[in-house]
Every structure is written in structure tokens, then in C-alpha cells.
A protein has these predicted regions:
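Bacterial Sec-dependent N-terminal signal peptides
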Residues: 1-20
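Generic recognition of cysteine residues
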Residues: 9, 31, 112-115
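Early exported N-terminus immediately downstream of N-terminal targeting peptides
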Residues: 15-66
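Terminal interaction module
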Residues: 18-22, 77, 143
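Long, charged/polar, surface-exposed segments that mediate recognition or autoinhibition
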Residues: 54-89
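Generic alpha-helical propensity signal that fires on short helical segments
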Residues: 65, 142-145
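Surface-exposed, polar helix/loop patches in the mature regions of secreted/periplasmic/lumenal proteins
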Residues: 75-142
Length: 145
């Protein structure tokens, strides 16, 4: 059962560059807070997978995560702004939610990024979501804080 959980964790955001962060290749997993929710608990939100990592980053790690996220943004559904929200400052992302191309029929994939500047580090949260929820649904459910 434990191996199955590890396997699901590794494949939820398979094929995405930010998977390097989730796998602990950018910063040690012991330095991150991670949560993975799957199944019926997400049914009210029309989601199947919600995978989140939160980490404290220095300038170098922030730049790496930002670059990986930007690479994944190239896989969004279209070039118009209807499938994403993006807020950036000084060339770095501070908030983003992006709908990616569908991985399976009638299943949407989303990546989210939030970076809060602290006194001597950056508080970064990355989220991967998968399910039938539309971007409009997610905007209602997870209002930007």
C-alpha cells in the first residue's frame, strides 16, 4: 500500500518540469511541506488529484522553480489569457494558475504557483490539480489570498 502511494505521488504531475520540485530534485524533500489528496475527499470540488508542496527558497531556488514553471506554461491550452491568471513583478512570477492541455479525455490539468517575499527568503507554494473542474470553478473555490 505504501509503494502504491509513492507511485501515485510520482506520477500525478508526470511529464511536467515542475515535477523536479515535487520529487525533491530542486530542494530536499525534508525541507518541504507536501500534501497529496486523491479520491472522494475532492469530489465536491470536481477534482481527482490535489498535490501541493510548500518551501522556503533563496534567490537561486526561486529562479529555478520560476524557470521550471515557465517551461510548463508553454503547455497551456492556448495563448490567450482565458486559461490562466498570472501576476509577475521584476521578471518573476508571484501568482499563477494555468490550465494545461488535457492529459486524458475530459480531464483538466492545472498548475498553480504562489511566491510570497519574506525578509530573507521566498515562501513558495506549488500546486498540481487534476479533474473535471473548470478554471472558473477553481477561481470560485480557491480565491487568491
Amino acid at each position: 500500500m505504501m509503494l502504491l502511494g509513492i507511485s501515485l505521488c510520482a506520477t500525478a504531475q508526470e511529464g511536467l518540469r515542475i515535477n523536479e520540485v515535487f520529487e525533491g530534485k530542486v530542494i530536499d524533500k525534508q525541507c518541504m511541506q507536501e500534501s497529496l489528496v486523491k479520491g472522494e475527499n475532492l469530489a465536491p470540488y470536481n477534482l481527482k488529484v490535489l498535490h501541493t508542496v510548500k518551501l522556503a527558497a533563496n534567490d537561486e531556488v526561486r529562479a529555478k522553480v520560476d524557470n521550471l514553471f515557465n517551461e510548463d506554461m508553454k503547455e497551456r491550452i492556448s495563448d490567450d489569457d482565458s486559461n490562466m491568471e498570472l501576476e509577475s513583478r521584476d521578471g518573476f512570477i508571484y501568482y499563477a494558475i494555468v490550465q494545461l492541455t488535457d492529459s486524458k479525455a475530459r480531464t483538466h490539468r492545472y498548475i498553480c504557483y504562489q511566491c510570497k517575499e519574506k525578509s530573507n527568503y521566498y515562501d513558495i507554494t506549488l500546486v498540481y490539480m487534476e479533474g473535471k473542474a473548470s478554471l472558473a470553478d477553481l477561481r470560485k473555490t480557491f480565491k487568491k489570498k
